[in-house]
Amino acid sequence: MSEKEEVLRQISEIKNHLVDKETFFPYNYNACHVWAVIAVVMTLVMIPAYEYSITFGAGLIFTLVTIGFVVEGSLTKKVNKSYDIDDCTKRQQFIMKNFFMISLFLIILTTIFAMHQLYGLIILIWLFLISLGYFAVGFVLNIKAFTQMAKFNIIISLVLLVVGAYFDLFVGSDSLFLTLTQAVVIFGLAVAPSWIARKQQKEELSSGSCSV
């Protein structure tokens, strides 16, 4: 074994020793940008799709969510390779499984609510439950911006749920209330997460350049 190979082997052993592959959580923030795009598309096309056909709407939403998870999975594997991690860590699997189960539950709820044309309620339920997922991500990654964003989304979704229920605003697809909830969701699940992810990427780049 050459001297260079020996040095590389020692570096790899040190890295493996320092990185707990069971609990470590490397994260590719490009996934946030992908989910932001999907959130915008889903928010805008979900209601027309379900109005066209319940089956078509459910299939379209399931397809978009599946695309999101496939892309995020590939991005996760990419960032894991930089830490010599061949598979997902336990924390990554935990978060991914939670988001996937939440998404399946949401698709079922959405289909049921769409049968009764409760479109405003559908949008708010997505905001509430996906924000719970972002709260978990913020907690695991120790990113206060994610947890604060999630708390804000949860609070505003609960407020709108109370207002919508009190004034009976959930039914229909052409109300001002629905437009308001769609705008809130686009900001809360697309604009805000993408902005936070971009900020985190810049911080990682700056810290990386400083350490060189």
What are these regions (language model features)?
Residues 58-67, 115-128, 180-184:
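Structural signature of hydrophobic alpha-helical transmembrane segments
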Residues 47, 51-55, 77-85, 115-119, ...:
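Transmembrane helix-loop junctions in multipass membrane proteins, especially transporters and channels
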Residues 38, 42, 67-68, 109, ...:
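Membrane-embedded alpha-helical transmembrane segments of multi-pass integral membrane proteins
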Residues 1-29:
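N-terminal juxtamembrane cytosolic/stromal segments of multi-pass membrane proteins
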Residues 136-212:
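Terminal transmembrane helical module of multi-pass membrane proteins
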Residues 95-150, 155-156:
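Membrane-proximal helix-loop-helix units in multi-pass membrane proteins
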Residues 25-112:
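Selected alpha-helical membrane-embedding segments in polytopic membrane proteins
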Residues 20, 72-88, 134-141, 191-198:
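C-terminal ends of transmembrane helices
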